[in-house]
Amino acid sequence: MARKTPLNRIRNIGIAAHIDAGKTTTSERILFYTGVSHKIGEVHDGAATMDWMEQEKERGITITSAATTCFWKDHQINLIDTPGHVDFTIEVERSMRVLDGAVSVFCSVGGVQPQSETVWRQANKYGVPRIVFVNKMDRIGANFYNVENQIKQRLKANPVPINIPIGAEDTFIGVIDLVQMKAIVWNNETMGAKYDVEEIPSDLLEKAKQYREKLVEAVAEQDEALMEKYLGGEELNIEEIKKGIKTGCLNMSLIPMLCGSSFKNKGVQTLLDAVIDYLPAPTEVVDIKGIDPKTEEEVFVKSSDDGEFAGLAFKIMTDPFVGQLTFVRVYRGNLESGSYVYNSTKDKKERVGRLLKMHSNKREDIKEVYAGEICAFVGLKDTLTGDTLCDEKNAVVLERMEFPEPVIHIAVEPKTKADQEKMGVALGKLAEEDPSFRVMTQEETGQTLIGGMGELHLEIIVDRLKREFKVEAEIGQPQVAFRETIRSSVSKEHKYAKQSGGRGQYGHVFIKLEPKEPGSGYEFVNEISGGVIPKEYIPAVDKGIQEAMQNGVLAGYPVVDFKVTLYDGSYHDVDSSEMAFKIAGSMAFKEASRAANPVLLEPMMKVEVEVPEEYMGDVIGDLNRRRGQINSMDDRLGLKIVNAFVPLVEMFGYSTDLRSATQGRGTYSMEFDHYGEVPSNIAKEIVEKRKG
């Protein structure tokens, strides 16, 4: 079966935004106008097609990115809806990895919010070209031009409007298309499915000309030939303008900007046109980096129908009817359902039972999947997020995704004995789906701990245990993931020698322990020369240190950001063994870290609080009491914005306190930023409590 849509007419796009910018509503409207859903799903009444997990319907926020396929003007658009809540940035990060372009949705009133900055940074990191859609133009306080300025100032980007609004708030009726220089006015009777193209209203002609001039100037900068034409006073034609916008959008030197109101069904078709005109096809983005597992050399995988199959698993979901779904972005070649595929990350072969095309929560069986597509594979057992699937003869390992360590842990206890076993299985499944969620057993108490990126993240996990897996669980107090590190350099030797009849044990090492930059992790350097320690024992020393660093000397927390150099030692022909050197390495590390000025580290959260001015003093006083460092204060739409770094341990229960302090008018967002040193008086309390 040949492919229906050629590769250059495919768009893999994500819709990314802050909570409440109207992202899910925008996705819904796209599905409505491209003919996928016959009744528009409203988030307000909990019926949106994209939000298909029960909790999402209740909370009105999007948690898992559903991948949906739709068609517009002979192009196939694969749409990935991404969550806007900060605890789910891992979801955004994974979808960014497999997108070719993105639509960033901003609220015309709220503008650039802290979460939008995070998502914007992630899109920059993966080099994803994007267009901006300013939504909710019908709301009181809507201001398109404010958002344009905020994108320049806060996101340091270059937004170039390609349409501007006609009216605002309740007088918003349509947009002026600056490329065609026409007014587009939507018809309310047809739910926005029809619109009229008219001449530009006389009162807006001046503004339209001014913005058209800005657009043409930005376009001319993209190409020398266009620049000459522009400077020579010649008009650029529509084709040239479109080509220039696309060039600038792909190299990210300009960001095309549009507006509309998804809820009121205005501006969605012009957004779809822009997706097709300006966002890249799979053939127009840079080739994906990978590694040849045989030679460990870097290779590039080009998006094309030619060549052997290669794809990346970017999401795993458990579906109540078909079991585990593995969402895969195909970069090269094609694959038929029922065939075998090689997981080069795990070095295992897997059989693909079925291939499913997802329409948010409806599914369609397909026989074959081609390059550039996004598709759900059924029947894979060992494949996890970030694994590469390919042809065994032409193996390649695509760039791995990096997942953050959890910053918060909560103990979970099953209510009954029957729940105990079910809980283990359920947590395992959830950890497979979400790489930023971890499950572990606390050694001292035997309790099960779950770790994640924030309170909401773990709340939803516990909620899913109850709902999807019917496991009743009690949760304990949240615990913070402290770390330990060292502040000074120390050299130590340790000789481990045991003689008690029969074969003895002998391992002798000299190590140097040095602090490293925050966030740089652990490094082991072997400087043994002349065979004073045989090379087969060196990995044992490293292993001993790695085991010992899981339990720091201060309070038993993992030790991070240090370098160990093994520079001398001795061995015994008969008595030396791997075990002896492992113990020697571990003891030397413990002794060295006691002497290297160990300190306790805690997760510091980047907190942004938005409050009316009259509560400003109370809020700042409260953040100071929580050991916060205030970084900046801004104004946004008549509210005060306080930016601060606050230790996570001080932020538990903050939402309730903020609500009561501001009579429900304050809001806040927080995300993990870095690990900071705990002040000595507080560190002392924590250490005493741990050693209790």
From Swiss-Prot:
Binding site for GTP: 17-24, 81-85, 135-138
GO cellular component term, pick one: cytoplasm
Record's keyword annotation contains Nucleotide-binding: yes
PROSITE patterns: G_TR_1 (PS00301), G_TR_2 (PS51722)
Presence of the UniProt keyword Nucleotide-binding in the record: yes
Gene3D superfamilies xref list: 3.30.230.10, 3.30.70.240, Elongation Factor G (Translational Gtpase), domain 3, P-loop containing nucleotide triphosphate hydrolases, Translation factors
Record-annotated tr-type G domain positions: 8-283
GO molecular function: GTP binding; GTPase activity; translation elongation factor activity
A Gene Ontology BP annotation from the UniProt entry: ribosome disassembly
Record keywords: Cytoplasm, Elongation factor, GTP-binding, Nucleotide-binding, Protein biosynthesis
Compartments where located: Cytoplasm
CDD domains linked to this entry: EF-G, EFG_III, EFG_mtEFG1_IV, EFG_mtEFG_C, EFG_mtEFG_II
Highest taxon of the lineage: Bacteria
Function: Catalyzes the GTP-dependent ribosomal translocation step during translation elongation. During this step, the ribosome changes from the pre-translocational (PRE) to the post-translocational (POST) state as the newly formed A-site-bound peptidyl-tRNA and P-site-bound deacylated tRNA move to the P and E sites, respectively. Catalyzes the coordinated movement of the two tRNA molecules, the mRNA and conformational changes in the ribosome.
Alphabetical list of NCBIfam families matching this protein: EF-G, PRK12740.1-3, PRK12740.1-5, small_GTP
Family according to the record: Belongs to the TRAFAC class translation factor GTPase superfamily. Classic translation factor GTPase family. EF-G/EF-2 subfamily.
Protein name listed in UniProt: Elongation factor G
Source organism: Helicobacter pylori (strain P12)
Lineage: Bacteria, Pseudomonadati, Campylobacterota, Epsilonproteobacteria, Campylobacterales
